Amino acid sequence: LLLTTEHTWGLDEKTHFIEPELWDPKDFHCESARKFASSWRERRKFLKNAVLTLPNDKAAEAIRALNRLRPAEDLYLKRNVTHDLVFENKFFRIELNPSNATADTIYMKANRFRFKNSGLFTCEMFDRDDYERFRWQYLRLPEEWWAIHDFTKPDMPADAEKKRYEGFETNVHLTEWGHGKRITLVTNEHPLFRRIEIDYILPDEEDWLEIRLKWFGKVAHRLPHAAWFSLLPQKSKCSYRFRKLDEWIDPTDVVSRGGRTLHAIQDMVIDERVLVENLDSPLVAPGRMSLLDFTNKIPDMKGGVHFNLYNNIWGTNFPMWFGDNMTYRFRIRAFNQW
């Protein structure tokens, strides 16, 4: 398992994939692209190999746990809801907005905490201007060949456009079972995905709300892009604590040049009252989405928090295109454990 965290995660792009013309997904079937991508598959096999080293009973247990995380399309959604889009149990009340696939309100009854306009799914595409700004903000050697290739996209097409896809029209489906309900927002119309499902899971007797975002048929772009999931408290001035390596830090109290715009975290506490568990997406941007804007400003937390679900903005040894189906889980519950 330790091999999966090695810094050189696959072949180095600037050495093994010098292909300035190959940016369209249909081009990735050529020999050089297949060789390049094979190094990522090799690294992903480390997880499978780790499972195979376990005793049979433990291996079977691990396989079952991993399979539960595998995204599956819910093709049997039956009850379509078009009005009265307020759902609740004794712990939460949520009001959904199918016009942009968000929750207008997530209200926690135990502590009267409220989120607004939350659960927003955003995709953004970057252009050359983004990288030029970032190069001079971030690189200590901004004119070195290796640094330019590692941290920017010098060969990206000049006509690559900066775009943002924010929210989307959905259908709403309700599924009820003996001990709770699941409300699902669904679209098959997103320009970068064949299908997106966002589940709001409300068990009757559990004090948490789980939001589960699943995507299917993602376009495997080489062009730089990112996907985000956002939460925004209604209260404009909230305190935040991020848990990193089991230490709690304040995102507004980070040393100058200490990486104020992005954090890898285990979970977070908002306003000393709410625990947010980001079970599958450790990278979070406080205040605003920020990948290629290496500002040294203290983040304005009025903008909420934004979890990065995917990006391919760096060069070096990481997957430069990715089309897998994915699941991301977020749990929200009251917090009183200091």
Model segments located where?
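Acidic (Asp/Glu-rich), glycine- and aromatic
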Residues: 113, 205-247, 337-338
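Residue-level signal for secondary-structure boundary sites
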Residues: 9, 193, 221, 315, ...
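Short structured motifs
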Residues: 167-171, 184-185, 195-199, 261-263, ...
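Preference for bulky hydrophobic residues occupying beta-strand positions
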Residues: 185, 200, 229-231, 307, ...
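Catalytic and substrate-binding regions of extracellular carbohydrate-active enzymes
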Residues: 3-217, 322-326
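Beta-strand-rich recognition/accessory modules
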Residues: 270-338
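Polysaccharide-binding surfaces and accessory modules of carbohydrate-active proteins
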Residues: 227-289
